[in-house]
UniProtKB/Swiss-Prot annotation:
One of its GO terms (cellular component) is plasma membrane. One of its GO terms (biological process) is queuosine salvage. It is found in: Cell inner membrane. This is Probable queuosine precursor transporter. Signal peptide: none annotated. It comes from Haemophilus influenzae (strain ATCC 51907 / DSM 11121 / KW20 / Rd). InterPro entries: YhhQ. HAMAP family: Q_prec_transport. Involved in the import of queuosine (Q) precursors, required for Q precursor salvage. Belongs to the vitamin uptake transporter (VUT/ECF) (TC 2.A.88) family. Q precursor transporter subfamily. It comes from the Bacteria.
Amino acid sequence: MKLTSPIFNDQQKRRAIIWLSFFHIFIIAASNYFVQIPFEITLKLTALGAANDFSFHSTWGTLTFPFIFLATDLTVRIFGAEDARKIIFVVMFPALIVSYVISVLFSESKFQGFESLTHFDLFVFRIAIASFAAYVVGQLLDVIVFNRLRQLKTWWVAPTSSMTFGSMADTFVFFSIAFYQSADPFMAEHWAQLGFVDYLFKLFIGIILFVPAYGVVLNVILRKLQMLVTERVPA
């Protein structure tokens, strides 16, 4: 279904943009908390004859943040690229504040008390700036790529491509700003390798889970919109 008819009036579009903006901020807040909770994945390569198993660390934030790419792609599909960009520009400064506040309040995934906000944390602020820049660059690139490809007949090409390039930009911008020549010696030395592994894992999760989720949600939305259009057409 090609969405060319004015299905939504201006008030409905404004309401949708407001709710989508809150959804973006919620996901950013949740991701800034869950990114502090790590887990380890071990691939038993020795069972296949390899000399060693392969292990890597990630965080639960890797699983929550792609919801923003899902929401952005659906926004471009339903409302268009212009409204998707509006949401990004509305959200980006609240996202900066939320990123800093959540990271300070829940340092190492433990509540530090509201008094922690009375002390400015430069290290955390740098991470918040990195999160801010990564969100803006990654989402704008996601909109550009998806908008260029959304008219293709093969539905999965647009979300897969936009998530691939958007996540790449998001990951590189975040790790380079947050940890390049960081006060943390380990992160300063290994940020590129850690970012690359993080990107591969996010890409895997995105393609396996979020691209199919995009297809399912889009089909549901299109059926609802088709019913709405049919009801409006005079008999």
